[in-house]
Amino acid sequence: MSRAYDLVVLGAGSGGLEAGWNAAVTHKKKVAVVDVQATHGPPALVALGGTCVNVGCVPKKLMVTGAQYMDLIRESGGFGWEMDRESLCPNWKTLIAAKNKVVNSINESYKSMFADTEGLSFHMGFGALQDAHTVVVRKSEDPHSDVLETLDTEYILIATGSWPTRLGVPGDEFCITSNEAFYLEDAPKRMLCVGGGYIAVEFAGIFNGYKPCGGYVDLCYRGDLILRGFDTEVRKSLTKQLGANGIRVRTNLNPTKITKNEDGSNHVHFNDGTEEDYDQVMLAIGVPRSQALQLDKAGVRTGKNGAVQVDAYSKTSVDNIYAIGDVTNRVMLTPVAINEGACVLLETVFGGKPRATDHTKVACAVFSIPPIGTCGMTEEEAAKNYETVAVYASSFTPLMHNISGSKHKEFMIRIITNESNGEVLGVHMLGDSAPEIIQSVGICMKMGAKISDFHSTIGVHPTSAEELCSMRTPAYFYESGKRVEKLSSNL
């Protein structure tokens, strides 16, 4: 049976666009990509390019960069730059306008891609499954809303990403999410970021850098330590440095109720009995975006928080339906979604050469202030998987901060190895340039680098990165899952 389309992609994010473009260009397939709007901003906020381009990585990195100038200006005095720092203040509106201009240009480039690519078409609306080979495009997420068109297809790719969710407490409708934070008219004077993940931590840095005079930023997290899943010592050091930067990190704390004050600000009740007023409360809690896709109509199985269940090749419980990216809740990173999209459509489905994305040793970054770069296992993960593990640790004050006046800004590097053969299992860094350094480290680790390879490499001086080549003595070990200062002599 001949169908109207070879492939329908739900979601025009990085992974979906990679898959759709490859199918159309490399394999000459007829492809339809469905998403809610073409250009960023209200009402849907997300558009061509997905979360990353519109309300994620790209605009957030621009805003973090802007926020870093607060410290650079303050620290420049030690290097001889004389100015009236008290009179300097950031202009939030200028930042947002500049950010919007960049995002607009990316949206336009994707529009041109659709216009210039034979066999690739964009369909605006909310896509949902009618059955395993039919996608309906509606006016809204409401399953009873008007149907704009119906797409008949051989294959379906679900690439709808993740989406902010609510707390589920009274008054949480008064809160904004990280999506709306990109479109605030003014920087809040009193800001609360709710969550302990990278989005909350990154936005805390942004709002701290752009807060009006006399303002403050709080970050509250229900757990003991922010950034669960990252290296423990890096998390502790970042928490300390955030505090030194003026951000109050409040752990084991969660809002239980939010009410509106007469002046429009938010009155927040916390689980420890305290109460506080904030101009804005931002929720940074995300879940896979699958709730409105009507996956049950095609028999597609989902798991915790609506994550689409897939095998190693990104195939769902239905043979002709695949899913990639955040909606599968595997490794929720844009480059991973792009790789998954290429593997699924370029090679597995239309290429006839099944290939799975390797989700191990994926380098990533947290653009906090200061930032984190990480790749591979934490020491706890390594200790569960290997009999003997060595942990190399170093922290130091980068050269510039001997003059800048910010000696609290330590650079931390931690290397985790399999002690039996020296293989580098994980590298974790905190400090300026850590995200740039970790990319090269990730390549080394993917090639199977050993700690001896690091030791035999001549470092670039003077840099923070050269410390990777100088860490020759383990700080401690793990043996049979337990931390020890030295290994048993019989090993």
From Swiss-Prot:
Record keyword Coiled coil present: no
Q: Where can this protein be found?
A: Cytoplasm
**Cofactor entry:** FAD
Location of the active site: H461 (proton acceptor)
What PROSITE patterns does the entry give? Answer: PYRIDINE_REDOX_1
Q: Give me the disulphide-bonded residues.
A: C52-C57
GO cellular component labels: cytosol; mitochondrion
Q: Which Pfam families match?
A: Pyr_redox_2, Pyr_redox_dim
* Matching SUPFAM superfamilies: FAD/NAD(P)-binding domain, FAD/NAD-linked reductases, dimerisation (C-terminal) domain, Nucleotide-binding domain
Binding of FAD: at which residues?
Answer: 35-52
One GO biological process term is: cellular response to oxidative stress
Q: Give the E.C. number(s).
A: 1.8.1.12
Q: What is its main location?
A: cytoplasm
Keywords of this protein's UniProt record, alphabetized?
Cytoplasm, Disulfide bond, FAD, Flavoprotein, NADP, Oxidoreductase, Redox-active center
Whom does it interact with, and what assembly results? Homodimer.
Q: Which family does it belong to?
A: Belongs to the class-I pyridine nucleotide-disulfide oxidoreductase family.
Under PANTHER family, the record lists: GLUTATHIONE REDUCTASE (PTHR42737:SF2)
Task: Please state what the protein is called.
Answer: Trypanothione reductase
What organism is this sequence from? Leishmania donovani
Underlying gene: TPR
